[in-house]
From Swiss-Prot:
Membrane-traversing stretches: none
Identification of the protein by name: RNA-binding protein 4F
Effect recorded for K41G: In RNA edited version
Effect recorded for S430G: In RNA edited version
Effect of substituting K164G: In RNA edited version
Organism, scientific name: Drosophila melanogaster (Fruit fly)
Effect of S141G: In RNA edited version
Superkingdom in the source lineage: Eukaryota
């Protein structure tokens, strides 16, 4: 016994004299969480001041740690309570929860202190900032006091019956500060029941767990924890740590751990497989090695990839990783990342390899942006493999079986193998949102979850999102809709349970948020409508509406009265509709009172009598309720900061002058009005006098990509159709010139490609491609119009640009239709049209009276701007005028009818001669066709 103590002291002395760099020389320094405490925190001599029994325990623990050469030893004379755990070196999530650090600092006792951002993800900085230890000092009392304070904080938080998310994060941080493995494990597992534990927290926990792992059973339990940690988030640091552990241990017995790990990470990290191949070569049993390789081929689809396939996968992976590194939090998945999935689908690989690469894209995306719900929803849509239409000629059963097989291949066989329900659960546990909660509830209903299971999941989500009132209300409404769909109205027990669910939801919202929760009374309105419709109890529905209208402020809201009246009218036979509307219009003030009054009048006209209609019309409309304006804060910014900056100093000086009397104000207003009129006239004259090509607009200060590219490109704007240039639209946002050149180069020689951008450097999704020959452009239109390019159906057409816009100020109203005009007087044109009509309508050469009447009518219509009528209609009008003329002739004096035949013949011949002369005068020899011809008419001598 004395020899053992002497050996321990000798080893302790050698360890104290050993340089620090020798202590840190270890293969696992990159992931090591054990740090030698500095002299300020405690010196090795502190162990001698303790009791002999504690000292002996510390030394025995120290010897046990030294007996393991693979892993770094602990500090001399220290136990597990003196090991300091630092944060991991893995890449944390980009999304940081605002106020998360403040939630963890000194808020152990404040249960109500939380914010809406508490539903965010956990960052490593939060764990480091929680429950900071007091400042370092040389005295043992300070260190002991800090430890006692942390211990008290941990006990107080752990004793809470229902912990909030922020409190659980604080609990984990305190546990890591205390360096107590049992506390760390219990706090991590407790958080695991509520939310998804991030990868960097798992990494810290595994490093602390490995320190005390020695026996085979402990190593087996440790590997089980590694497998559990790998099933939450895609994390390269975590996978590297597990792979390095297995390689250093020479562990090839855990076939499942290796196979599932490579199934998830071999796409990005083929070096993991290379390390495993070197270990497989050391297996002496050929049957065991063959079975292991067979399992790897079954799980990891990239295990047997050749060099060419690896190169194709590597190009897509590297491109996506670069894009992901450059991507910030403000992006749109459907517009930005959809092209990467399309690139994978166009590769000449089998479906298993494509699905593996696409899963990698999704897993890396949700690992970096875990709170972006659209990523989780897109991932779920990919796994579901829905939206594929069955052809008419194909057998539906065979196609369905094929789709089921393809869907099974999309799931993968690694630790991150998730169905759509598992993905929705992961997304909700990572960061709940209204869309994700709705999707998760829908998938649980499709999977035939029991009501108790659904209630438990909803309870966990509500516990997580208690700080977000709007999301909580939406989740309650989604849950109530689920209960309505799954309630049998003929079962009294289910009906009572449904009513209890409505009552519980309303009471819980009232307790949590008071009068601020569900101010539109959507829960109660839904309950009332269910009572009216599905449960067939209008009395209960009316009672719920009376409860709604009894709340403060609801009686002045006209839309609520309208909904109440409509339910009574539609589902209760209109028994209480009149009373509801009369009570609404009897309010002193009312929002949307006109809508209520109009509805009341329509109802009375449809179902009422003369007396009831008159009584309804006699009701006065209440005063419109005007919401009080919110006070402007002193530090609030104006909505028009530019206008405030551009105010002249004269207006600021005028505020200091004496107020003007009425006459001075009238004169000032008159002068301002005259100045405005003069400015408008001056602007109109200036726009009229400016030549079309003489004045040049000032150069724009904004130099966007469109301007820069216009200088670089050889394109020239043409207002006419360009038969050798094509116009392409509906392109994906990340489109480049090289991609378009590659797309259209098979149809001919491309001279230039131009992408059109906005001034804010945003791509419009359109481009111009110019070919050398028109035939090449025609072939490009025929070959590429409507084709699928990077996930988008593009449209290709011959370029026919509209007239180029000018820098003039556009009118605020729609511009009038412009018609091409010339300098030829419209009278001559009308005469030409009338002459043509004369030739067409002339039935006989001698019928002068009818033709002259038709010419007059035609000229009159043209002069008034009326539309030209058809030939049949004109003939009918002409006959009517001839009949009127004959009737007028019958009323003339008889003396005129008794004229001689000779005199009548002379008059008719004179009329014919005059008509011929008039016809020759009205029809010129040559109608001017242009401005030059028109000038020649007036330049003749």
């Amino acid at each position: 016994m004395d020899a053992d103590k002497q050996l321990e002291r000798q080893l302790e002395k050698e360890l104290d004299e050993m340089p620090a760099e020798d202590l840190d020389d270890d293969a696992y320094d990159e992931y090591d969480l054990i740090v030698i405490p500095d002299q300020g925190k405690g010196s090795p001599q502190q162990g001698h001041s303790e009791s002999p029994q504690q000292e002996e325990e510390h030394k025995s623990e120290e010897l046990r740690q030294r007996s393991r050469p693979t892993w770094p030893p602990s500090s001399a004379g220290g136990d597990m309570t003196t090991i300091e755990l630092i944060s991991s070196d893995d890449e944390p999530s980009v999304e940081e929860t605002e106020g998360g650090n403040a939630a963890g600092r000194g808020r152990a006792r404040n249960d109500s202190s939380s914010s809406s951002d508490d539903v965010g993800v956990i960052e490593g900085s939060e764990l480091e900032s929680n429950s900071e230890v007091s400042s370092d000092s040389d005295s043992d009392s300070d260190n002991a006091g800090g430890g006692n304070q942390l211990e008290r904080s941990y006990q107080e938080l752990n004793a809470l019956p229902s912990k909030k998310f922020a409190q659980m994060v604080s609990l984990i941080g305190i546990a890591f500060k205390l360096n107590d493995l049992e506390k760390i494990e219990s706090s991590v597992l407790e958080l695991q029941n509520l939310a998804t534990v991030p990868a960097h927290v798992w990494l810290k926990y595994l490093k602390a767990r490995l320190v005390v792992t020695q026996t085979d059973e402990e190593r087996k339990a440790f590997e089980e924890q590694c497998a559990k940690a790998l099933g939450y988030y895609y994390s390269i640091p975590l996978s590297e740590y597990v792979v390095n552990y297995l390689v250093d241990q020479g562990n090839v017995q855990n076939h499942v751990l290796w196979a599932k790990l490579l199934a998830d990470y071999d796409v990005e990290r083929p070096d993991f497989g290379d390390k495993l191949r070197s270990l497989i070569s050391t297996i002496t049993d050929e049957n065991e090695a063959a079975a292991f390789v067979e399992m790897l081929q079954k799980h990891c689809v990239t295990w047997t990839c050749n060099v060419e396939q690896r190169q194709m996968i590597k190009s897509v992976v590297d491109k996506f990783k670069q894009h992901l590194d450059e991507t910030t939090r403000g992006w749109d998945w459907s517009e930005q990342h959809k092209a990467h999935v399309y690139d994978v689908e166009t590769l000449s690989l089998d479906d298993d390899l494509k699905n593996a690469v696409i899963r990698f894209i999704f897993e890396r995306s949700v690992a970096k942006f875990p709170i972006v719900d659209v990523l989780w929803l897109s991932y779920i849509e990919f796994i579901q493999f829905e939206g594929v239409t069955v052809p008419e000629n194909e057998d539906e059963n065979e196609v369905t079986a094929e789709m089921v097989a393809k869907r099974a291949k999309r799931l993968g066989k690694g630790f991150l193998r998730n169905t759509e329900l598992d993905l929705a659960n992961r997304g909700v546990r990572s960061h709940p949102s209204v869309q994700l909660n709705h999707r998760f509830l829908d998938l649980m209903e499709r999977s035939d979850f029991e009501l108790a299971e659904v209630d438990e999941e909803i309870r966990l989500i509500l516990q997580r999102i208690v700080t977000d009132m709007d999301m909580t209300v939406e989740l309650h409404l989604d849950y109530l809709a689920y209960r309505i769909r799954n309630t049998n109205a003929s079962d009294e027990q289910q009906v009572a349970s449904l009513r209890a669910a409505f009552n519980h939801a309303w009471e819980e919202l009232t307790v949590l948020y008071g009068d601020q929760a569900d101010t539109r009374y959507e829960v109660l309105q839904l309950w009332a409508q269910v009572e009216y419709t599905q449960l067939g109890s209008p009395d209960n529905g009316r009672e719920i509406w009376r409860q709604i209208m009894g709340y403060p402020g609801s009686s002045i809201r006209g839309l609520l009265w309208l909904n109440f009246a409509q339910m009574e009218s539609e589902y209760n036979g209109g028994h209480g509709t009149r009373d509801v509307l009369r009570k609404a219009l009897s309010q002193p003030v009312l929002e949307n009172g006109l809508m209520v009054q109009e509805f009341f009048r329509r109802y009375e006209r449809c179902y009422g009598t003369y007396e009831s209609i008159a009584a309804c019309q006699a009701l006065d409309l209440p005063v419109e309720y005007v919401k009080p304006r919110s006070r402007i804060k002193p530090n609030s910014q104006s909505a028009y900061p530019r206008q405030q900056k551009l105010k002249p100093r004269q207006q600021q000086q005028q505020t200091n002058r004496e107020p003007l009397n009425r006459e001075q104000r009238r004169r000032q207003a008159h002068e301002q009005q005259q100045q405005q009129q003069q400015q408008q006239k001056h602007g109109i004259k200036k726009s009229r006098t400016e030549p079309s090509g003489g004045a040049t607009s000032p150069p724009s200060k904004v130099k966007g990509p469109a301007n820069a590219e216009a200088k670089e490109s050889n394109f020239k704007y043409s207002p006419n159709m360009e038969i050798n240039k094509i116009f392409v639209r509906n392109l994906h946002p990340a489109c480049s010139k090289e991609e378009l050149h590659e797309l259209f180069s098979p149809f001919g020689t491309i001279k230039d490609v131009r992408l059109v951008h906005k001034l804010n450097k945003q791509f419009k999704g359109i481009a111009y491609v110019e070919f050398e020959k028109p035939g090449e452009a025609q072939r490009a239109v025929a070959g590429r119009d409507g084709c699928l390019f990077k996930g988008m159906n593009i449209s290709v057409a011959i370029s026919n640009p509209p007239p180029r816009g000018t820098s003039a100020v556009k009118p605020s109203v729609a511009p009038k239709r412009r018609v091409p005009t010339s300098l030829i007087p419209t009278t001559l044109v009308r005469q030409e049209v009338a002459a043509k009509k004369l030739r067409l309508l002339l039935p006989e050469p001698g019928d002068i009276s009818s033709t002259s009447a038709s010419v007059d009518v035609a000229i009159k219509r043209e002069a008034n701007g009326e539309e030209q009528k058809g030939d049949v209609q004109e003939r009918d009008e002409q006959k009517g005028e001839e009949q009127k003329g004959e009737e007028q002739k019958g009323e003339e004096p008889k003396g005129e009818e008794q004229k001689g035949d000779d005199q009548i013949g002379e008059e008719q011949s004179g009329v014919e001669q005059k008509g011929d002369e008039k016809k020759e005068e009205e029809m010129p020899a040559a109608v001017p066709k242009s401005n030059d011809d028109f000038r020649k008419l007036f330049l003749k001598d």
